[in-house]
């Protein structure tokens, strides 16, 4: 197993190198910063272990640029709940706060190694379905109230802002609103503001004419135009660069765009749904988000409760995911023991549905018996 360690602290980096030298089945390549790692990472690597707080580029931005190509583990000396949640959102398998026992990190590495080896031996005929992005897997009183609000606003053209923690299902709600609207037969286009580098975001949204910049060898339609007559979903809207917010405000108000390198405006007919897990009042007070744009986008706010407030959904979602994974990998039927079920119900799920689905998939693969035990979940309570 080939592992990249990205750590700016030379003492920590050397300590990990020395510790892992004792493991004959692990090949370690260390980097002092994400930039060096990005230049060298290739298909031969299986796992990336990265710090978060590093100069020039932090670990979370580094992971976003990797786009899930590698399994990942985060180590940091300044852990916060928000960083842990952001890590889960980016698909990080484990999160260690310094100082930590290297033996625990090693255990996490070998769990990941076992999953990767299993997946290589049992390649899927087709990727696991992701129904959580397009439909609701379970029901609860809190969820039904949010669905009622979404259904009511779907028949209108009002802009909607979906509020809630990362992983609660905001994209599911965006699809739900689109599917129950008069625009359902037209495009639904989603764009994550934090997933596209800032220097590319404007051209992706607005499009460009030939010659607008060095690499613009042909005209390209932007996402706003592509969504015409349909819905555009602006995920993580709070991360939109400030200088682009004024341009978005004009699009929302005037329903027209101008491609880069052009002086001619184009009318568009789109419905805006945005989503965020940020405190927008704080963003506005800090002058990181325009208040006028906020009011234009949040005509109808819908708050989606976190999974820990929708406890009755946890086991149904877990059981659906467990069956899906077992069927996909031909593992035979598996179930949760009473203790495992109790653990799932009592865990806080700061990563919400996204975290739950990942935990269940890992447990299904790693468990040796037909009944998944609490120890197979690897959840700290």
From Swiss-Prot:
Residue numbers of 4-aspartylphosphate PTMs: 51
Keywords: ATP-binding, DNA-binding, Nucleotide-binding, Phosphoprotein, Transcription, Transcription regulation, Two-component regulatory system
Positions of the Sigma-54 factor interaction domain: 136-365
Disruption phenotype: Disruption leads to loss of motility due to the failure of the mutant strain to express the RpoN-dependent flagellar genes.
A biological-process GO annotation: positive regulation of DNA-templated transcription
GO molecular function (one): cis-regulatory region sequence-specific DNA binding
Binding of ATP, residues: 164-171, 227-236
PANTHER family: TRANSCRIPTIONAL REGULATORY PROTEIN, TRANSCRIPTIONAL REGULATORY PROTEIN FLGR
Role of this protein: Member of the two-component regulatory system FlgR/FlgS that induces the transcriptional induction of the genes needed in motility and flagellar biogenesis. Upon phosphorylation by FlgS, functions as a transcriptional regulator and activates transcription of RpoN-dependent flagellar genes.
UniProt-recorded name of the protein: Transcriptional regulatory protein FlgR
Organism: Helicobacter pylori (strain ATCC 700392 / 26695) (Campylobacter pylori)
Lineage, highest ranks first: Bacteria, Pseudomonadati, Campylobacterota, Epsilonproteobacteria, Campylobacterales
């Amino acid at each position: 197993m080939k592992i990249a360690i990205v750590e700016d602290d030379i003492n920590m980096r050397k300590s990990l190198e020395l510790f892992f030298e004792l493991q004959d089945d692990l090949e370690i390549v260390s980097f002092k910063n994400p930039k060096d790692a990005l230049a060298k990472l290739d298909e031969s690597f299986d796992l990336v272990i990265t710090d978060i707080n590093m100069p020039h580029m932090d670990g979370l931005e580094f992971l976003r640029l990797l786009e899930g190509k590698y399994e990942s583990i985060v180590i940091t000396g300044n852990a916060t709940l928000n960083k842990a949640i952001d890590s889960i959102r980016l698909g990080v398998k484990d999160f260690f706060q310094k100082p930590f026992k290297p033996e625990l990190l090693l255990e996490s590495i070998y769990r990941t190694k076992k999953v990767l080896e299993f997946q290589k031996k049992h390649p899927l005929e087709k990727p696991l379905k992701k129904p959580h992005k397009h439909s609701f897997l379970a029901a609860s009183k809190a969820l039904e109230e949010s669905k009622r609000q979404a259904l009511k606003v779907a028949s209108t053209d009002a802009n909607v802002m979906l509020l809630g923690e990362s992983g609660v299902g905001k994209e599911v709600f965006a699809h739900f609103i689109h599917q129950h609207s008069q625009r359902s037969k037209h495009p639904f286009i989603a764009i994550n503001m934090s997933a596209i580098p800032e220097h590319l975001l404007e051209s992706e949204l607005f499009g460009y004419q030939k010659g607008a910049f060095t690499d613009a060898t042909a005209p390209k339609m932007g996402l706003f135009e592509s969504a015409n007559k349909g819905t555009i979903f602006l995920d993580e809207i709070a991360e939109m660069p400030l200088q682009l917010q004024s341009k978005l405000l004009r699009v929302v108000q005037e329903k027209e765009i101008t491609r880069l390198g052009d002086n001619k405006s184009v009318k568009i007919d789109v419905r805006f749904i945005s989503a965020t897990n940020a405190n927008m009042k704080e963003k506005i007070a800090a002058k990181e988000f325009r208040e006028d744009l906020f009011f234009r986008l949040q005509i109808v706010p819908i708050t989606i409760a976190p999974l820990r407030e929708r406890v009755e959904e946890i086991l149904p979602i877990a059981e659906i995911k467990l069956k899906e994974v077992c069927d996909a990998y031909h593992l035979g039927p598996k179930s949760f023991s009473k203790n495992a079920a109790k653990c799932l119900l009592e865990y806080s799920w700061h990563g919400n549905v996204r975290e739950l689905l990942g935990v269940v998939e890992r447990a299904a693969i790693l468990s040796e018996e037909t009944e998944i035990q609490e120890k197979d979940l690897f959840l700290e309570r």
